[in-house]
Amino acid sequence: MVGNGIDHHPTKAGMVIAWLFDEEAKAVFGPRPMITDLRTGAMAGGSGEQAVLTASAIQMARHYGLPSSTIAGATHSKLPDAQSGYEKCLTVNQSVQAGANIITHTCGAQASLMGISFEAMVIDNDMLGCILRATNPVEVSPKTLSAPEIGAVVNEVGHFLGETATFDRMHSDFLYPEIADRADIEVWEAGGSIDIRQAAARRVQEILAEHRPNYIDAGVDRDLRALLPIELLPLA
């Protein structure tokens, strides 16, 4: 595994060549170390070893003071299940913690990047939001410490729920997942006892039914459809 780092030198060489042609050329150090399961020869993109190699490549970029790009979020699972979740979170979180500037392939990919799942995209969106929230620095200041509010609560009402500072922190300090379940058991059972894959499937159907972005002028859209056999839903 350590020798894998040698393979990153051609990437740096390519950047040097670009700068020889143009000193102002924009270049990103983007190594893609990948792990193979030696029992089968298949890619093991969701493994702990993959997380370590990716982090080491990113740290190499930081050592040289270069902006970095990498891939993370691969899983060998064919479905957006528990294996998919832990493998994706492992490699994405490790890459973020290592300091990657750009991370691709983080959302929706299944079966070692050979397939895409809409449900996985929705689930992974929650996961990625939590990872990014976990990497935000904690701001320590008189305002965030809220010592006067703490003193007032201790000596008076006995709880923070009615405080303005609590309401403000609710909107500034917390990220609320879109589909992850945080209800108590009774509410969950009353809602049909669905798991996250079922919740994601519902959200996918809502998005497909309601989200109709219009990026192309209606006239251009008609001309393209008349010229080419494009089998897409017409613009609303």
Kindly give the residue locations of the regions a language model identified:
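Catalytic-core signal marking the mid-to-C-terminal active-site face
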Residues: 119-236
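Histidine (H) residue identity feature
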Residues: 7-9, 63, 76, 105, ...
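A glycine-rich phosphate-binding loop feature that marks nucleotide/adenosyl-phosphate handling sites
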Residues: 29-37, 71-80, 108-114, 147-155, ...
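Helix-rich catalytic cores of soluble enzyme domains
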Residues: 1-101
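Acidic/polar loop patches that form or flank catalytic/metal-binding clefts of enzymes
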Residues: 66-72, 102-107, 137-147
